[in-house]
A protein has these predicted regions:
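Sec-dependent N-terminal signal peptides of Gram-positive bacterial secreted proteins and lipoproteins
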Residues: 1-18
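A residue-level marker of the well-folded mature domains of exported/periplasmic proteins
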Residues: 13-339
Length: 339
């Protein structure tokens, strides 16, 4: 019975999408009051994504449009069904944080069939005719992580703890990191003793991978962790092994990570202004729904096309510039961090 009901729901959703597919993409001319924005987000399990959701929704509403956000909690099938639902409801533009960069191409296909444009938010959907991509310079993120770690140690055993292999950004972070590390590796100054992706960006898996290495080699000089979640898992493993204080990078400027930086167990994080990203994306979503022209600053190839892209600059954060960066920007307060 359940399978029958699911089948009927999907069939109904697809039928409604087919009914909508009568207008070519971009032909409507709407006022802001008429615009309905759909935001399909991978997960709300990580601290930063709550911020994206809240800021994005608030900005869309400030612009006079309607918005609905659906989170898939890391499930590809759920994310595709959520996109179907929003298309069935008649959204004018779809903003997507993909769980899987390849599988999410199906969402673009469905949206275009319904005459709806797609913005790839923060993570690039691969091998699809994505209309616009907005994110940060993600190779630069990896470079910033390594450069700060090298300020503390430039020889020895290094570990690279990556993000989810299904996330295109994880590959870009690694590319940026390795572009800086490679000369040190080539001349024998640095030995990479761990180089793995972390399934689902799960801190527990990052911890397990680190513990496996430490069980055979209790001599780690630095860890490049792709984000603050994986950094937290790594630091737990290092602390258990009596290696707290080993330089560890991160990303996202999560409150827990910034507190670790103050405590000296994490070396740095990379701040990507969620205010800037979410507000910019919201404005662009409404503009695209109204069929207005969008200025982009470059293109990024996603395996199929060169996607018009807007890339914002990431900022390295250490214990020396917390006040000048994330506090000044209003992302966190002194009370949040130091109390």
């Amino acid at each position: 019975m359940l399978l029958v009901l699911v089948s009927v729901f999907i069939h109904a959703a697809c039928s409604n999408i087919e009914e909508q597919a009568t207008k070519p993409i971009g032909e409507s001319h709407l006022s802001a009051d008429d615009v309905y924005v759909g935001f399909v987000i991978d997960t709300l399990k990580e601290e930063r994504w709550y911020s994206d959701k809240e800021i994005f929704e608030e900005e869309v509403k400030q612009l006079g449009a309607r918005v609905k956000t659906l989170a898939a909690n890391g499930n590809d099938d759920v994310q595709i069904k959520q996109a179907e639902l929003l298309l069935e409801e008649g959204v004018d533009v779809l903003v997507v944080v993909p769980h899987n960069a390849e599988i999410s191409a199906k969402i673009v296909e469905m949206a275009h069939f319904a005459g709806v444009k797609v913005i790839s938010y923060d993570r690039l959907i691969r091998n699809a005719n994505v209309d616009l991509y907005i994110s940060f310079d993600n190779e630069q993120v990896g470079k910033l992580q390594v450069e700060e770690i090298l300020n503390h140690v430039s020889k020895g055993n290094f570990a690279y703890v990556g993000g989810a292999e299904s996330d295109n950004n994880a590959h870009l972070f690694r590319q940026g990191a390795m572009s800086i590390l490679q000369p040190y590796i080539d001349r024998g100054d640095i030995r990479i003793v761990l180089d793995e992706f972390t399934e689902g960006w799960n801190p527990s898996i990052a911890q397990e991978n680190m513990e496996k290495v430490l069980s055979n080699l209790n001599d780690i000089d630095a860890v490049i962790a792709a984000n603050d979640g994986t950094a937290g898992g790594v630091i737990t493993a290092l602390t258990k092994a009596g290696l707290q204080g080993v330089p560890v990078s991160g990303q996202d400027a999560e409150l827990s990570a910034v507190k670790r930086i103050v405590d000296g167990t994490q070396t740095m994080t990379v701040y990507k202004s969620i205010q800037s990203l979410a507000k910019h994306a919201a404005k662009i979503a409404v503009q695209i729904a109204k069929n207005e022209e969008i200025e982009t600053n470059q293109t990024i190839n996603n395996g199929k096309i060169d996607v018009p892209s807007i890339l914002l600059e990431p900022i390295p954060v250490t214990n020396n510039n917390i006040k000048e960066t994330i506090i000044k920007d209003g992302y966190l307060t002194e009370a949040d961090i130091y109390n």
